[in-house]
Design a protein with these regions (language model features):
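NAD(P)+-binding Rossmann beta1-loop-alpha1 motif at the extreme N-terminus of oxidoreductases
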Residues: 1-44
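Rossmann-fold NAD(P)-dependent oxidoreductase module
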Residues: 14, 18, 114, 160
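Short, well-ordered alpha-helix to beta-strand connector turns
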Residues: 23, 60-62, 115-118
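Glycine-rich beta-alpha junction loops
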Residues: 33, 95-97, 125-128, 150, ...
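Rossmann-like NAD(P)-binding element
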Residues: 46-89, 93-98
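General beta-strand structural signal in soluble alpha/beta enzymes
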Residues: 51, 119-125, 169-172
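Rossmann-fold NAD(P)-binding glycine/threonine-rich loop
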Residues: 94-137
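Active-site-lining helix/loop region of Rossmann-like oxidoreductase modules
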Residues: 143-206
């Protein structure tokens, strides 16, 4: 599959690299066509790794990962182009670092509202980027969540997550449930501080 990964930071690099290892063709998108981080990444991937602007990547990808900083995600997706996202699944893994817990909408909801013809699926935003792409880094079973309005889109992402190694996924419901996972961030940050590592996750025992 041709997949766009928007964002050149640690998360974008981890997701894009995993997808290439799994055999997908991946274009890493950034604000400029000559982004140094994106260019350096392509040197590690062989022919399946490409780089371009946000818009280039959105045109290229049959599926789009939003791995940008949550505070700039809407601007990045706008640069990608609403027409280029139409009908496509947009996997939103971003968090706003300082979420407004009184806000009426999550970032996932804001993206869905701004791009109503895209199929937004919120997932992977409750773990660090190493665990996102390698859940076996932690022993035992642990859980990842899905939120989105389109059932077929969530089923497809569920299957993609299985190829990442995820065996326990919970579909929370429509995109409004992204508020729950985004609101987990303050607890996640407190746990990171207390444990001295971000390599942890939660297991929903049932």
């Amino acid at each position: 599959m041709k997949i766009a990964v928007l964002g050149t930071g640690m998360v974008g690099n981890a997701i894009a690299s995993k997808l290439v290892v799994l055999g997908h063709e991946v274009m890493m998108g950034s604000r400029t066509a000559d982004n140094a981080k994106a260019a350096a990444w392509t040197q590690t991937t062989g022919a399946r790794g490409l780089a371009g602007t946000f818009a280039d990547a959105a045109v290229f990808g049959e599926l789009v990962f939003n791995c940008t900083n949550g505070a700039s995600s809407l601007a990045a997706l706008s640069a990608a182009g609403a027409a280029n996202l139409e009908g496509k699944i947009v996997v939103d893994v971003a968090n706003v670092l300082a979420p407004n817990l009184q806000a009426s909408e999550s970032l996932g909801e804001q993206i869905q509202k701004a791009f109503p013809r895209a199929k937004v699926v919120k997932t992977l935003n409750t773990v660090n980027c190493e665990i996102m792409v390698n859940p076996q880094k932690l022993p035992g079973s642990h859980t990842v969540f899905l939120s989105g309005n389109d059932q077929d889109a969530k089923r497809m992402i569920h299957e993609l997550l299985r190829t990442f190694g995820w065996t326990d996924t919970i579909d929370l419901g429509d995109i409004a449930t992204a508020r729950a996972t985004e609101s987990y961030l303050p607890l996640w940050l407190s746990l990171w501080k207390q444990l001295g590592t971000s390599t942890f996750n939660i297991n929903v025992v049932r």
